[in-house]
Amino acid sequence: MPTGSPVDATEGSNHSTRRGVLKKRVASFSNGIHIKSIRIGLASPERIRQWAERVLPDGTVVGQVTNPQTVNYKTLKPEKGGLFCEQIFGSIQDTDLTTTRDRRSRLGYIQLVSPVTHVWYLKALPSYIAILLDLPKKHVESISYCTETLSVPVAVHQTTGTLAPNTSTGRATTETNGDRGHASPISVELNPSTNQNSMELFDAPRLTKSSSNLKLTSDLGKAKQPLLLWESSSRSKWLRGNHGDFQANSNLIFQLNEKCLWFNTFYNSLKLEKSWNLEFPESARNSFVKKKPSKSPTGPSNTSSGDSLGKDGTMDHVSPHKANLWGSSPLKREGWVKSAQQTLTQGSQSYPYANGLSFNEGKSKEMGVGALRPQGSENSLFGTHDPFDHLSTHQVKSEQNLFKTPTFDNSKQSNTAENRDSFSRTSARSWIINNYYSVLQTCRWKSPSDWDLFLFYMTSSVNSLDKPIPCYQNRIYDSSGLPFDFPISGGAAIRNLLLNFDPVREDLSLIARQIENQSAKYNQEIRVLEQLYVNGLFMTRTQRKVLFALWRQRTKVLRRLKLVRYFRQTNMRPQWMVLSVLPVLPPDLRPIIQMNGNQVAVSDLNKLYQKVIFRNQRMLRFARGQYTINNSPEMRYAGRLLQEAVDALIANGKGGGATISDANNRPLKSLSDMLKGKKGRFRQNLLGKRVDYSGRSVIVVGPKLKLHECGLPKEMAIELFQPFLIRQLRTNKIAATIVGAKKLIRSGDQIIWEVLKQVLQNHPILLNRAPTLHRLGIQAFQPKLVDGRAILLHPLVCPAFNADFDGDQMAVHVPLSYEARSEAWKLIWARNNILSPATGEPILTPSQDMILGCYYLTTTDRIRFKSTWLASKSQQTGDSEASFAMLRPKHGPSGRKPTQDLCTKGSAFFAPDNTAKQSEASFALSFFSSQEEVLLAYHHHKLSLHSLIWLKWEQDFEANTTFESPLEIRVDKNGNSTHLYRNNLYRFNSKGEKLQQFIRTTPGRILLNQTISQTLFTKQV
């Protein structure tokens, strides 16, 4: 009979199954992932979402972090949707399907409202974004931080609609760029029976707080012109005070047969931030005639417009004049206008129509929230405004309660987002806009007015007679359907500029070719100027400045060309340097740890992520409010704050940016701070592991070592080579057992060092100094036993290790196998690593102590020499021999012929009672016949290391006697002459034949020369 019930057996089997699943998961983690290579590059927003998003069993897609909260500090449980959310990053406890190790690898992401530039590519030296765009770095940073805009004409014409024909379908689409940054197309149908198929159309201009002055159109005789109708005259006047002028001017219409629309509009007169007067020039007033307005009810219940056209709604001809007389202000989402605050105003608009142009659809809309715009049944292509045009289809369900029911009298239509479907329009992208961002900045005009005219021409709308250019058929659009020249500041503007350099575009090769042609032009101009120097011609200061400027421009162009080629080769897209999706690290890499008591330690990354989310939500509220992306100062300031928050997260305080600190004024550690440096993630946790047969000690200079040798302390050598030493002792029958060999080693017998020298003779060691930045950071050396506890190193190999002798430490590694030792001798032996693998230049260059020592040996003590010479001259009396300026020799060619025993026959050179100073004063100008005599006098302290002497020289030497005049020429009675120069002396006979030559030198230079000669003669390295 079984001891347990079936239920118990089932539960036991379930527990065993769970343990088996957990064991498999742990085993899979312990196996690890074998990575062959890693390439660092740019990640697209789609790739980041792919890394972070995952689908739950119920079909919910999670991964986006929307809540800035981390955990509940009372229960320490993660907040839903926050930076420690269990749905996004994994469970905090082991379950049947997952373990807590998932929280070390799962990413999240933050969807940014406005794109921001990556600080590594913006503020680095050099700035890759500035190089690629060929713009000054300060201007690119100003645009990124929303302190500068790309161009004013783009902002003025952002509400301009365009009508682009589609010859294949016989239809055309006009799109209006509203304040929200989303297109609201209106579909119209063209009559194929007429030749006049389209005309240039404009939406009603809108005033924002940043728009203070708009131009008046003075010439109304043109058929096509921008419609800029009013000026802002005063902020102190209300529309109520100007109501009479507005209504009087609105009754003026053209005298031709035109369609005249009348509309009644409610205005919010108490919440106006600007007021304006309509002003018309004298030339325009002649085009107006008075006409009695059509009768229409003016009661507050009338919210629709009346039409004074005929039944067919068409016209016989097109008027050459057009006008549009109304005002507007930003759409306000909150606060409806109360009945007591409403003021009824009547206005009219007049506009021409093409023959045969009929409307395909009519929209019935209601007034927006506090908007100063005409509402009602609008069958016009002018002034059409959809209060829901900022919403997309997938946003309707999530924003059902965004709008409230209006309080207008007798309002029968609802104004909620549920009616968004009735206002939906098909998206159209069949229009063309000139792209002026690809124009080189070197072609800019110096005059701002000329530049504005050029931008106005390039940003003008499409005419019906325009034909599309084949090269621009595949124009790249943003994901929102807008052309990439819409944003004028912030990261979105930089991203749209970088879209021109997308490798998938065909014209990127044209840009590269253009840069190559510009580089060739610079090379040609540089060669012309350099040829002047080669031919020995004189180069003026202006030409020299031009040459330096051309060198700088060529370097800049080549750097840009190299960057463009890199993007083409790697297939990376430059717009990925602008972040629209920000990845969030796994929570276990930025933990929250509970300390003793109620204290909690929070990683700095959590605070930086929170600041990014807070500012992103702030910008989202502004985007849903009354502020536009380009024109609102509030929106630009919010974008700048978001940019600074992301910069602080990636690299806090980089490039002189604002540093985010904690309550103790300590800068928070960013992602870059956690990666770089000695305490960074790589060097602290991933590198520098302990290995066997290795040691570490301080390095000191060993000038007597050869280049491939290093001094190894005896204490370290005993420990590192103990197995080899024991084997050698047993092989030589010195010790019978391993225990006996170890006992002999501990005794420190003299025979141990002899055997150890034999072991080290054919066994290299590897020296390494961290950080190992290139392959020369680890080299093989022949060890030599030295006393002490420091490693001796030849000073010439220090540049390869970037080492000096101020306390640096180096690690010693012992290659064990024969293969490792053979590779050490052949590949990384120090005497074979003479040239740098990066530049090909010699890397074994003298530096620091060696240069200082050589300088000290070869320098001259001119001040001391002059004082001793003057002292010796003052003691001379009745000298019949005239002096050779300052270099008059006391004994030498003028007194008697120099012989081999010149120094021995001089005045008291070896006198024991003379001091070194007196001997030096006497022999400061002495002549010596050989280098050995000079060194002998130096070792007897008769000369100092820097004493100037004359040395007889039998070999040739380099002298500047061709361009140098002798200081003095002396001729004796026999015709023999002596020519004295600054650093040499010649004696000729009467026939002009050279008898002797002397060079002026010092004992230190002679000592250095002999050392170098001996080294070269013995072929030592």
From Swiss-Prot:
This is DNA-directed RNA polymerase subunit beta'. InterPro entries: DNA-dir_RpoC_beta_prime (IPR045867), RNA_pol_asu (IPR000722), RNA_pol_N (IPR006592), RNA_pol_Rpb1_1 (IPR007080), RNA_pol_Rpb1_3 (IPR007066), RNA_pol_Rpb1_3_sf (IPR042102), RNA_pol_Rpb1_clamp_domain (IPR044893), RNApol_RpoC1 (IPR034678). Belongs to the RNA polymerase beta' chain family. RpoC1 subfamily. It catalyses: RNA(n) + a ribonucleoside 5'-triphosphate = RNA(n+1) + diphosphate. Residues 161-185, 287-330 are annotated as: Disordered. GO terms for biological process: DNA-templated transcription. DNA-dependent RNA polymerase catalyzes the transcription of DNA into RNA using the four ribonucleoside triphosphates as substrates.
